[in-house]
Amino acid sequence: MTKTEEKPFGKLRSFLWPIHTHELKKVLPMFLMFFCITFNYTVLRDTKDTLIVGAPGSGAEAIPFIKFWLVVPCAIIFMLIYAKLSNILSKQALFYAVGTPFLIFFALFPTVIYPLRDVLHPTEFADRLQAILPPGLLGLVAILRNWTFAAFYVLAELWGSVMLSLMFWGFANEITKIHEAKRFYALFGIGANISLLASGRAIVWASKLRASVSEGVDPWGISLRLLMAMTIVSGLVLMASYWWINKNVLTDPRFYNPEEMQKGKKGAKPKMNMKDSFLYLARSPYILLLALLVIAYGICINLIEVTWKSQLKLQYPNMNDYSEFMGNFSFWTGVVSVLIMLFVGGNVIRKFGWLTGALVTPVMVLLTGIVFFALVIFRNQASGLVAMFGTTPLMLAVVVGAIQNILSKSTKYALFDSTKEMAYIPLDQEQKVKGKAAIDVVAARFGKSGGALIQQGLLVICGSIGAMTPYLAVILLFIIAIWLVSATKLNKLFLAQSALKEQEVAQEDSAPASS
């Protein structure tokens, strides 16, 4: 096999485009796959929120119930089905078998299911149920009342974890060599943010078309068809890119040699069940502190997002207006994320160290969270002051909530994720592999469902999102305090572990010289 000669990159090119010309055959279709998956992820995320929050008899209070009672069980059921299919089908057939049902559902939803919603939804039964049950269970009744929208929400939520985390990264890690990954994966991160810009603009365009719709036609129905048409086209491009890679890249020995790839892998990641994960976390203070960071982020974002979306519905009760705002929100998340990743992320960690990088996200969530909750809780008292800015307390709460979300997510992508991955570096191979598996099973799941569970409990006790907001603010402060303490303690362990590893490396280097 002749190896293509690779010249070293210049400083500017190594920063902007660290790809050799002959590698374009591999990296461009992978980039396109990643772009399509993340484009769909944004369109589906914003659409599912619009459907559930804007549905009749529903609101943001339905989200915690859907996440806990529908998304988590469906994710478990999917993994069981996936495990069975992976033993029967080839890897290529498995990819199509997993992706196709999503696209079929997203094609049927705007053309068949949504137009028949009045027939399919048990509105009268839900009304009777709502009259009997306490106000805190309105979210649970809303799921039944709009069950087809809830089904859309579940599949949209699963798209991210299934197609991105499982199918794409599983495929990419299998076919990408370590020296390629160091260069390719950073580009995929930029691709994700470019897709945010594209999908954000697309959502705004589709949502604004209501102005040209004739009277008597449901404008959101038209927007929904356009959004899902874009999702289907993007999904088909994704499938075509995957097919092309299998046909043209994986048959080229320059890019893929199964035997060589197997040698390069340092052992498979152990599959840990929930019990094993808990035991491993309990035995390792280092991994436990790292898990607390992940759990704290998941809970904090969840607590603020649902309250923000409830304010958003009050400001934009019309589905098209709500969707247009979410499109703009996604667009600006992409813009800010790119700027922070390029000019802030790496520089903060390099100049100020791991701890500063790890503390930026919780401090950002704390400061913006305090301002947001203050505007929601003290809305009436602040109306005179807010009027000086030419707006209303509600609109200001919506804008501050959007800024809070954008900054929190941008710093998460640029700094939180980087410091989290850096924390694994000083660990030995077993700790790295088992620790990552434990955090994937426990921390990721607890972060998402923990916030939903807290909100469900408060909704049942308080009766509405407005009534529970002061308690949410107190819980947020408590969780952030745990986050800050955990990061500070982990920093001490990280520095000690790093020094120990450097000492071991220095001893290994000096051993041949002294002998």
UniProtKB/Swiss-Prot annotation:
Q: What is its main location?
A: membrane
Where is the protein found, in the record's own terms?
Cell membrane
Q: What is one term from the GO cellular component aspect held by the record? A: plasma membrane
Instruction: Cite the GO molecular-function annotations of the record.
Output: ATP binding; ATP:ADP antiporter activity
What UniProt keywords are attached to this protein's entry? ATP-binding, Cell membrane, Membrane, Nucleotide-binding, Transmembrane, Transmembrane helix, Transport
What does the record say about its membrane topology? Multi-pass membrane protein
Q: Which domain of life is it from?
A: Bacteria
The transmembrane residues are 24-44, 62-82, 93-113, 124-144, 149-169, 184-204, 226-246, 286-306, 329-349, 358-378, 383-403, 465-485
InterPro entries recorded for this chain? Answer: ADP_ATP_car_bac_type, MFS_trans_sf
Family listed: Belongs to the ADP/ATP translocase tlc family.
| Protein name (record) | ADP,ATP carrier protein 1
- Organism, by scientific name, is Chlamydia pneumoniae
Gene coding for it: tlcA
